[in-house]
Amino acid sequence: MTHSTAKPVPSARRLAYQALYDVLEKDAYSNIVLQRILAEYPLKAEEAHLLTELVYGVLRKYNHLLWIIGKLSTQKVKKLHPSVRILLAISLYQLLFLTRIPASAAVNESVKIAKKVTHPGNVRFVNGVLRNFLRKKDSFQLPSREEDALLHDALFYNQPRWLIEDWQNAWGVEKADAVFSAFNEIPSMTIRVNPLKQPVADFERLLSEKGIEAAPIPYLPEGFTIKSGANRFFGAFLKEGLAYVQSASSMVPAKVLSPKAGETVLDMCAAPGSKTTQMAEMMGNEGSIDAWDLYPHKIALIKKNAKKEGITIIHAGARDATKPMPAVHEKYDKVLLDAPCSGLGVLSHKVEIRWRRAREDLVEFPPLQKALLEEAAKYLKKGGTLVYSTCTLNEAENENIVSEFLRNHPEFTPIDFQLEGLGASEKGMLTIWPDRAQSDGFFVAKLGKSD
């Protein structure tokens, strides 16, 4: 007789600690870490919800939490052991923002985890800091804007001081504040329906039958915002390729490029393939799309997504898109260059980016973007259309790149466009503001090559 021993399932707080350690100390991505943990452990619904809330909540409030830790600690926050810093942040987040959780549970669980992951001295330190907070919890008021405007905003919006300063200087305080507020909203799930498998109207009825409330995205006929019932959506719909989870802003570049059936299209920086498959669906799976990316494992992901969605016109291959490819000069009717960027438009979805970027990091992106755009221009047929896009709001990676390119390439001209709810482009360029679109920040430019 054999006995099978089930793998013990750690608590939501223990798993949140593990996830946050990987994100904050090992540069993992929160969404990928959470997907892995949720796939590995059969958590009850309430535990899965708490895990997700703790991970994203701590990341969204990290500046505020570290500031409080600094007020309570006899050591400088940066010198604290990472385990201590993360455990204190998890506990303080619960004590400050999850009032449904008893204070004793928040404190005792962190002390229990500390005993497993660090030495006794740190355990005592964690316990002492948390008990100290409970005694003083009503005394932690943020400094006012009159006292220190930059510190206030960095703590209130939970953004790095350099980013607060740069964007307030660039756009004015009111506009920057609106963008920072939008970044701290929990994003709604948005999906793109696959019309190759089912007409959009039929899919909309199917959502309703399943008790899933969805609202059409005005500028995207195949796009929907899931208002409620999102948990019921992660099943057959996705596995069968009936729909794809994608941010609304991310769907705009392909929409603007508007590839047609029978055309030849290049997606230069294609992984994970969301825009590639979107274009194939727009083309009715007729024509040809070459999809490039630098890394073979990402190419495998593009192929996997294409197969799942029933797409046969995508030809994906590993390429360094900065290297000249004379064999494909003037081959394509349309080219999409969704360029690598600083990612400063997607801070609501990829919360951790705000804690990884520094002002000096931003200089590395424009040279790469310029090189890629120069190559993209060579691959486009005369009379063809090129779309350049990024998921950042940094002007040096957006308007400046396109404006310089147009000055150097008189054979290219901007093509203006308009999208319902997002407004009209100016000189072929449109910034999608997260506070206006209720989606990620994006930049899209549409350029035509003369005959």
Residues covered by each model-derived region:
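S-adenosylmethionine
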Residues: 1-451
